[in-house]
Amino acid sequence: MTEHIERPGDTPMPQPEKTLLALCPGAEFMVKYLSHAYGEQWRVITRPEEGVDVDAAVMISSTDIYDVIEGNACDEDTPVKADSPLARDEAMFADYCRRHELPCLILRAANIVGTGMTGLPMRIARGIACGMLMHISGNSATISVVHAIDVARLSVELQDAPGIYNITDGTDTTIDALINAIAHRMKDKNVGTLRPRWARWLYGRRYYGTLTRSLTFDDSRVRRVLEAEGRSTDMINVVQRLNTHQYVQDDI
């Protein structure tokens, strides 16, 4: 048997004292961001565990829940898809919080950009990597995005203000600008340009529509709450960060 001998100056590793339940359907990569935001005193679990008391809860939902494929400044009152798995998960999460007397915080994040990202940003990145994703001539479509760091930060800051919030970086970036920024992050990968007719043939009607329709979301509700609590409403500009941030090994 090996005995551990503490040396002078050894600092024992802090043990988590609290538990966060984080439901992140389709965005499980957010767990590492949440762990970083909450700190070492918190343990993050992604589903209830028997015998484990939960001290706080958050659901990282998505603006994909809304029954809309095109529009500008869609707010939290926008109708949701009747058959959306996210709507079902939100209802189950709200019921869990009610039964366990926990504040119910649901963040409907726009397209999340960060390490391990999923959804449209990852599809764009993979398309760039294999040379299949190109600009579409004349495309001026805009979308909402948000950085994973801000989503995690707000999950901490809004624990005392439970509710449902849209989360964006507030910039409503163009698809072209996001493509260029992701390409820059990937060692300045070259991205060509296609005429709409060829792009429609290459990508298919659905993905072509995603790339060419504007769909942005209003986040004024969360900004009002932050202002009322004296907190900063500044968000990371996703495109700017991708273009200028000097990434190091410890970045998440």
Where are the predicted features?
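NAD(P)-dependent short-chain dehydrogenase/reductase
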Residues: 100-106, 110-143
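Substrate-positioning beta->alpha
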Residues: 22, 117-123, 136-162
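Catalytic helix-loop patch of NAD(P)-dependent Rossmann-fold dehydrogenases
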Residues: 68-106, 111-112
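Mid/C-terminal beta-alpha module of Rossmann-like enzyme folds, strongest
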Residues: 154-207, 251-252
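N-terminal Rossmann NAD(P)H-binding glycine-rich loop of SDR-like oxidoreductase domains
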Residues: 14, 18-39
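Amphipathic terminal alpha-helices
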Residues: 2-12, 18-20, 229-252
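Conserved C-terminal active-site "lid" loop/helix of NAD(P)H-dependent oxidoreductases
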Residues: 148, 174-180, 200-230, 247-249
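Non-catalytic, hydrophobic alpha-helical segments
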Residues: 148-151, 167, 178, 222, ...
